Amino acid sequence: MTQEALQRLFPEAVVVEVATAADEDDSLLHPAELALMGAMVPGRKGEFAAGRNAARRALGRLGFPDATLPRRPGSSDVHWPEGIMGSISHTRGLRAVACVRTSQLRSVGLDVEEAGPLGDEIIDAICRPEELAALAQSAAPLPSDWPRLVFAMKEAAYKALYPVTRRVLTFHDVRVDVNASQRSYRAEMPDRPAPELQVAGRFHWDDTWVAAGAVIS
């Protein structure tokens, strides 16, 4: 999936970067980032380095050319520079990041996943009954493995919501209303309404990956 395809998931204010093989070089990391790698296995180290280095490149486009990206104290969350919200996502063969200034959008979320079918039990754990019913009847084209796309939408929505709400959510805590013809969706928390949090997103798929982006205005 190309950087251009992922960029189209977001408004113009959001900067997207896709990691390259060169980004797996951990010698490019800052000391505070290297310290986080600890006993990671080699594959995870490359994944971590790729995400941080791609994020630094995205931040450079927003005016933070040499930012260090440690974790928040007591958390696994990335500690973004003041005035920035960002989201890093990775799956086999694809690592990407989305960043935005908080003066333009309140939050952002990105999720990329390998394409492929999910088992019935997993689908039921991800999708609410009304989502299953609505998407099964969609007249607009969707991939055959559309439940995985719903997974990506909810992951992206959660990544946008959590920094704002600090709420730990299950998949069923979030409901997505999908406009398949526009490849867009809205996400809400029906059991814990927060009308001030308008989560809007877009999605994309190809033969290899599915992806979703989400923003809170």
Predicted regions mapped to residue ranges:
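Core catalytic alpha/beta fold that binds nucleotide/phospho-ligands
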Residues: 1-217
